[in-house]
């Protein structure tokens, strides 16, 4: 959504992986026309598509009595059509691949809802349901469909909260460890961005060639469900 951040990320990747073929494009995943154009550009540039990773999301923090109708509708639209639009746009190219996969970045909220994020939890559960259904529908076309379920992962938002902390003597490691302990994360820390990325790489690649319809927990053991 932010062209400057996108350009910066692309520049960093090119510097780290000078031999890689990187195409950085911006589109609104809720705009089906933009997504279709994006899919055409990607397919034309690379000559085909083997994998699609859906990673559009945010959270609406509010209890039931503080959640307006607009928030319910937006959360449902973003979580569902943020996947539906890309899948519809890339499906023709994926059907031509011999190693095709679709992987959705979801949240542990899908199976473990929290009261203060009721709309987001419900939308995440709907996405997990749809992802499993897609895995059944697309397996006959040779397309695997899986998800990862994220717990608490280090991010820019957490860094901003750290900068605003009251105890300036706490290091980043101490501050995040305290959060993890309060929330009851068994591994006693937040996840690092590369950890869900590695899970995505596994599920999206032929390393997981016999896996479809799965939801891989990446939460440091924070899950409470069976």
Where are these regions (language model features)?
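Short, small/polar-rich loop/turn modules that mediate ligand/substrate recognition or access, typified
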Residues: 53, 139, 144, 211-213
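Substrate-binding pocket helix/loop in short-chain dehydrogenase/reductase
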Residues: 63-64, 71-76, 181
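Residue(s) in the substrate-gating loop at a strand-loop-helix junction
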Residues: 107
């Amino acid at each position: 959504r932010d062209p400057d951040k996108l350009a910066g990320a692309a520049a960093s990747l090119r510097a780290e992986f000078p031999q890689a073929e990187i195409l950085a494009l911006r589109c609104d995943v809720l705009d089906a026309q933009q997504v279709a154009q994006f899919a055409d550009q990607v397919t034309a540039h690379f000559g085909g598509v083997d994998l699609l990773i859906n990673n559009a999301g945010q959270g609406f923090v509010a209890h039931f009595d503080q959640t307006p109708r607009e928030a319910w509708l937006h959360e449902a639209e973003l979580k569902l059509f943020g996947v539906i639009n890309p899948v519809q746009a890339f499906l023709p190219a994926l059907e031509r691949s011999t190693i095709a996969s679709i992987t959705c970045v979801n949240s542990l909220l899908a199976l473990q809802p929290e009261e203060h994020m009721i709309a987001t939890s419900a939308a995440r559960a709907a996405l997990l349901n749809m992802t499993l259904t897609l895995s059944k529908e697309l397996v006959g076309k040779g397309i695997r469909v899986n998800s990862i379920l994220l717990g608490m992962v280090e991010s820019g938002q957490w860094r901003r909260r750290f900068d605003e902390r009251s105890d300036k003597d706490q290091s980043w490691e101490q501050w995040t460890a305290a959060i993890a302990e309060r929330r009851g994360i068994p591994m006693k820390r937040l996840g690092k961005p590369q950890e869900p990325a590695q899970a995505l790489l596994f599920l999206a690649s032929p390393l997981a060639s016999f896996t479809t319809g799965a939801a891989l927990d990446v939460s440091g053991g924070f899950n409470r469900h069976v």
